[in-house]
């Protein structure tokens, strides 16, 4: 039995997202997938590595439920899709956590069994029978093959045929240890029988192994067996165990072809539709290579119906963050543009007020223009009559005339102007003369307003 290491802290994942790293490195383009049952590991694959320090192998996760509860929970979840679900499915935290620990070699657990206690290897070497039934591996492979009733209803052999580093329902079965795994891989006799056991179970499901790379296809009796598989959901738990054991004993590359085949039959051919939830929630996530998982999930997404209920794709959080960033940038730009527009409007309003001021000044000039010669008569002038008859030749007059539509000049005599001028008009004329002395005052005021 495995035991938790004292003094070593491992942060238990608390969400599905913590357990699932499938889409964390999704920059490379994916090639077109081969046909159903095809696929193998290629160069450049990304084997998933633990996020924590290197874990100790072996042992049953202490934080997991008890063995019977563990299997019952898995069986209930994997068998919960006996009919086509109409509601949108949800990710299972139990499944995500269980498969996270498997892919990461069961973090922070170590072997406490003696290295010479190689129960699983000795069983596959035909040295000991599996308990409690007392049947040897050779008898299972020769006499149980094709006996689908026995394979269906006996629930103690599967833990011996496909051992794991975690406890199952059969307490007589022993968990694998790191040392035992290495010894098992070196033993050709054990490997040969292990592959025969795998073929036997594939045929029980209606599938056959077609080559040494792990490709699979429909068996001769596939219709009968697929119907049975579609109705017996406890076998989905067995498939999960088989996939895990393949990875432990050196056949990781066999997983993808089998999972791809099951997805094709469930989603495209619709021969085993009830298995699709377990295939997407469990089978896919037994694969340690992120790239292979992404290929399978992309294939499933193309054929999953209804498409809006597919929940195993890239996290929507990352997509929404990207859209939020775009939305954040556009309001900033629009606010900047609005501020610029407001600034321009302020300038325009100031310019318009300046123009109004100029127009008012011009109107005042028009009013007092006939009175200016009075001031000229007050000043000493050698030719008062000529000055009164001629238009004024100052810069202010020319500016005023350009800005206004040539005001009419009334020629009056100095005597008439003297009679019509009052003290108030004299003051206004004085102010107007001050503006004429500084012909640039209007422009300066305009500049001050703009600033």
From Swiss-Prot:
It comes from the Eukaryota. Disulfide bonds: none annotated. It holds the Pfam family OGFr_N. Residues 1-89, 308-451 are annotated as: Disordered. Ubiquitous. Keywords: Receptor. Residues 362-381, 389-399 have a biased composition (Basic and acidic residues). Belongs to the opioid growth factor receptor family. This is Opioid growth factor receptor-like protein 1. It comes from Homo sapiens.
């Amino acid at each position: 039995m495995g035991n938790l290491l004292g003094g070593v802290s491992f942060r238990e994942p608390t969400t599905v997202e913590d357990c699932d790293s499938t889409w964390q490195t999704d920059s490379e383009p994916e090639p077109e997938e081969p046909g159903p049952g095809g696929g193998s590991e290629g160069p450049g694959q990304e084997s998933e590595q633990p996020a924590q320090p290197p874990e100790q192998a072996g042992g049953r996760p202490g934080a997991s439920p008890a063995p019977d509860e563990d299997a019952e929970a898995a069986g209930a979840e994997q068998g919960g899709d006996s009919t086509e679900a109409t509601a949108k499915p949800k990710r299972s935290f139990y499944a995500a956590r269980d498969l996270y620990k498997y892919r990461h070699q069961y973090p922070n657990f170590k072997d406490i069994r003696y290295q010479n206690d190689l129960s699983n290897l000795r069983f596959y070497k035909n040295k000991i029978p599996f308990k409690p039934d007392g049947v040897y591996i050779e008898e299972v492979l020769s006499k149980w093959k094709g006996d689908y009733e026995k394979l269906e209803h006996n629930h103690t052999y599967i833990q011996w045929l496909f051992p794991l580093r975690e406890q199952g329902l059969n307490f007589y079965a022993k968990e694998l240890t790191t040392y035992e795994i290495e010894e098992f891989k070196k033993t050709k006799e054990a490997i040969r029988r292990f592959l025969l056991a795998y073929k036997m179970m594939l045929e029980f499901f209606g599938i056959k192994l077609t080559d040494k790379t792990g490709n699979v296809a429909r068996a001769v009796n596939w219709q009968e067996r697929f119907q049975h598989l579609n109705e017996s959901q406890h076998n989905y738990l067995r498939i999960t165990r088989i996939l895990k054991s393949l990875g432990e004993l050196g056949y990781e590359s066999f997983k993808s072809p089998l999972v791809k085949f099951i997805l094709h039959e469930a989603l495209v051919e619709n021969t085993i539709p009830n298995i699709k939830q377990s295939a997407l929630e469990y089978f896919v996530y037994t694969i340690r290579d992120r790239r292979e998982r992404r290929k399978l999930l992309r294939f499933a997404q193309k054929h999953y119906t209804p498409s809006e209920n597919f929940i195993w794709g890239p996290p929507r959080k990352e997509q929404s963050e990207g859209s939020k960033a775009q939305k954040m940038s556009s309001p900033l730009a629009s606010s900047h543009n609005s501020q610029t527009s407001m600034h321009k409007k302020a300038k325009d309003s100031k310019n318009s007020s300046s123009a109004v001021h100029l127009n008012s000044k011009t109107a005042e000039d028009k009013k007092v223009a006939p009175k200016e010669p009075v001031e000229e008569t007050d000043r000493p002038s050698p030719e008062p009559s000529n000055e009164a008859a001629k238009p004024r030749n100052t810069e202010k007059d020319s500016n005023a005339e350009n800005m206004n539509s040539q005001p009419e000049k009334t020629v009056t005599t100095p005597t008439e102007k003297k009679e019509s001028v009052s003290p108030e008009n004299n003051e206004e004329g004085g102010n107007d003369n001050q503006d004429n002395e500084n012909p640039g005052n209007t422009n300066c005021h305009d500049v001050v307003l703009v600033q």
